[in-house]
């Protein structure tokens, strides 16, 4: 795979990465599950998934796509496509993260507990699925993202921990 293909894959997924990480900084407030419990007696999602974080991530990811358009308009073709793609990547990311939290609660994993694979690939796979109708990337680039995303996720978590935005470095 050529370097420009790797950069294109990274460029494509950038709104999703920002959408996934921004709730750490922008979150707080009312939990998405409103404190309700599932039929197993455990919280549906937990306090870590809030409306402010969800919509903050959606907005940040979409803004990243708009900025990308103005930096490299030929990649998208139109501002409308850039907004639509960034929005869907961001929405997919956040929905994927919510699904991951739901699964973790069912497995009785506490908030913030690392779930290797689920934490790194769940949001990525959901983002790619949501964005599929608008713009896809070649299989090789998807595979590259599957390899690089856990490393980026790990690095971002350590950075957020050192900045005091997260209580744990994972």
Swiss-Prot record:
Q: Does the keyword Magnesium apply?
A: yes
Provide the topology term for how it sits in the membrane.
Answer: Multi-pass membrane protein
Record keywords = Cell membrane, Lipid biosynthesis, Lipid metabolism, Magnesium, Membrane, Phospholipid biosynthesis, Phospholipid metabolism, Transferase, Transmembrane, Transmembrane helix
User: What is the required cofactor set for this protein?
Assistant: Mg(2+)
* Compartment annotation: Cell membrane
Enzyme Commission number(s)? 2.7.7.67
InterPro entries, A to Z:
CarS, CarS_archaea
Q: Supply the enzyme class, top level.
A: transferase
Task: Describe which pathway this protein belongs to, using the record's wording.
Answer: Membrane lipid metabolism; glycerophospholipid metabolism
Major place of residence = membrane
What reaction does this catalyse?
Answer: 2,3-bis-O-(geranylgeranyl)-sn-glycerol 1-phosphate + CTP + H(+) = CDP-2,3-bis-O-(geranylgeranyl)-sn-glycerol + diphosphate
For this chain, one GO molecular function annotation is: CDP-2,3-bis-(O-geranylgeranyl)-sn-glycerol synthase activity
> For this chain's UniProt record, which GO biological process terms are given?
glycerophospholipid biosynthetic process
Disulphide bonds annotated for this chain are: none
Q: Which Pfam families match?
A: CarS-like (PF01864)
Q: Which HAMAP family match?
A: CDP_archaeol_synth
Q: What does this protein do, in the record's words?
A: Catalyzes the formation of CDP-2,3-bis-(O-geranylgeranyl)-sn-glycerol (CDP-archaeol) from 2,3-bis-(O-geranylgeranyl)-sn-glycerol 1-phosphate (DGGGP) and CTP. This reaction is the third ether-bond-formation step in the biosynthesis of archaeal membrane lipids.
In the record, the note on similarity to other proteins reads: Belongs to the CDP-archaeol synthase family.
**What is the protein name stated in its UniProt record?**
CDP-archaeol synthase
> What species does this protein belong to?
Pyrococcus horikoshii (strain ATCC 700860 / DSM 12428 / JCM 9974 / NBRC 100139 / OT-3)
